[in-house]
Amino acid sequence: MKTVEAMRDFFLAGDASELEKAYLEICGPSQGEASFDPDWQEVEFAFNRLFVGPAALEAPPFSSVYLDGQSLVMGKTTLDVRGMYGALGLESPWKNTLPDDHISLELDAVLAINHLARQTEQVEIQELRKRFMTHMQSWVPLFAGKILQAPSSHPAINHVAKCLSQWLQEQGEQ
């Protein structure tokens, strides 16, 4: 779960130092292509082009962009995700600031669902987990693909996208 927390934090990072900290949590001391030493200011610049703006985002981190058909944020998917959070008794701490279908908020919901699933064997929680993972599997591969194809991407961000894809694939196998 530490990796999921670190991926959540990576996609919510506000600056180069937060990106570096989350990245090192994801990668551990040294891991394949992750063992290089990136210029974190360059990573921050690429991160902003991909996920923040102010220009058009190269890889929007919102499920509604990929699932609602018009590349719009705050669509039907956002409200569906908000409903799933509500079923868990959760509310986004960024409500009215950051759309509920942001990748980091969805990863945070996975952490909450997994925590609840470990504490109870309620069928409803297991079904909600399955529904939420199906939702993530419907859009995260598209999101990761956008990252990997984006002209502004950076090897560090590409590595995180690959880790996210690998984690999601492993979840589907459980």
Language-model segments: what does each one mean?
Residues 1-174:
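Surface/interface-facing alpha-helical segments and adjacent flexible terminal/loop regions used
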